[in-house]
A protein has these predicted regions:
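TOPRIM metal-binding catalytic domain and adjacent DNA-binding surface shared by DnaG-type primases
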Residues: 1-41, 84, 193-200
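Generic hydrophobic, helix-prone segments enriched in Leu/Val/Ile
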Residues: 1-4, 21-23, 56, 77-79, ...
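Exposed alpha-helical structural elements
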Residues: 8, 12, 150, 170, ...
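Generic structural "secondary-structure junction" signal
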Residues: 15, 20, 26-28, 58, ...
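TOPRIM fold recognition
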Residues: 88-91, 96-200
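The Walker A/P-loop phosphate-binding site
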Residues: 197-220
């Protein structure tokens, strides 16, 4: 990747809450998709499932994003490696800043899908490569429902789960609005299995016939 260098202090990532994060940045102007990217803009390397570099995503200080014409997008991703839950849980997020947020809060590995359109193919590839992993779609909560719907379809395809942020937008929006601790709690709450109802293990008639103290024990 010529005309790039690793550095921190990127304007876009600073706005997203990560001023000290080191990323790959442009060192020269590059025009693609009708947008002129400048030195200091983010470069997100994208790899296929074999680990070959197949494209990059460029992000300017305003958050405009483009991939290079002719490069692979479907099934391509950027991976932020984590040490916690390695081999046990894998996250997939739409955007780079969202993925950074999830990684920062969990310490776990996160795949960057670039867009909701790529979630399905990426989730399927992830399941093939990691058959024993829990796969979590760190979805966007869109006003039009697009992020939620595509994440749900991807989760169905890979037998994964969806973690929706409590606010409209993405997990980075939650992070900026509510801070790290509250967002960390929200993200783990989103993937916690629901409490088992007493009716899951007995009939309603059996539950009704129990004494008040027995019911209390069952519910709590």
């Amino acid at each position: 990747m010529e005309k790039t260098r690793p550095a921190s202090g990127n304007a876009y990532l600073t706005r997203k809450g990560f001023p000290g994060h080191e990323c790959v940045m442009l060192t020269a102007t590059h025009k693609t998709g009708g947008v002129t990217f400048r030195a200091g803009d983010v470069v997100v390397p994208l790899y296929d499932d074999a680990g070959a570099l197949v494209n990059v995503q460029l992000i300017n200080s305003d958050g405009l994003k483009r991939t290079l014409k002719g490069g692979q997008v479907k099934g391509a991703c950027h991976i932020i490696e984590g040490k916690k839950q390695a081999g046990k849980r894998l996250w997939i997020a739409e955007g780079y800043a969202t993925a950074l947020t999830v990684h920062h809060l969990t310490g776990e590995t996160v795949m960057v899908a670039l867009s909701s359109v790529n979630l399905l193919s990426l989730a399927s590839l992830a399941r093939q490569k990691h058959p024993a992993c829990q796969i979590v779609l760190a979805a966007d909560r869109d006003l039009n429902g697009d992020g939620q719907n595509k994440a749900a379809a991807a989760a169905d395809a890979c037998e994964g789960v969806v973690a929706l942020p409590p606010v409209f937008g993405d997990w980075n929006d939650t992070f900026k609005q509510h801070g790290g601790e509250a967002t960390r709690k929200a993200i783990y709450d989103a993937i916690r299995p629901p409490a088992q109802s007493p009716f899951d293990t007995m009939s309603e008639a059996e539950f009704t016939a129990m004494s008040t103290s027995e019911k209390a024990m069952r519910v709590h």
